[in-house]
Amino acid sequence: MALTQERKNEIIKEYARHEGDTGSAEVQIAVLTADINELNVHMAAHKHDFHSQRGLMKKIGSRRNLLRYLRNTDIQRYRELIQRLGLRR
């Protein structure tokens, strides 16, 4: 259910702004998006898993806050990121 370390490292390499970047908003949003997508698949098969549902809602809230931060600080990076991730904003 959780992302494997290899998959997480791939995402970090793809969205990092510089070498060793693991904490930028883009990387955090990309990792959360991958987690959210996996949890959505899990929730489709396990509709009554309320503990996972709560975790999904917390991850969505965290991603929303990071997206808001990025939009307010650098609108161009925000637009590029949502296009790359395929988010509906």
Curated annotation (Swiss-Prot):
HAMAP family: Ribosomal_uS15_B. The keyword rRNA-binding applies. CDD domains: Ribosomal_S15p_S13e. One of the primary rRNA binding proteins, it binds directly to 16S rRNA where it helps nucleate assembly of the platform of the 30S subunit by binding and bridging several RNA helices of the 16S rRNA. Part of the 30S ribosomal subunit. Forms a bridge to the 50S subunit in the 70S ribosome, contacting the 23S rRNA. Belongs to the universal ribosomal protein uS15 family. GO terms for molecular function: rRNA binding; structural constituent of ribosome. This is Small ribosomal subunit protein uS15. The keyword Cytoplasm does not apply. Disulfide bonds: none annotated. It holds the Pfam family Ribosomal_S15. InterPro entries: Ribosomal_uS15, Ribosomal_uS15_bac-type, uS15_NS1_RNA-bd_sf. It comes from Leuconostoc citreum (strain KM20). Gene3D superfamilies: 6.10.250.3130, S15/NS1, RNA-binding (1.10.287.10).
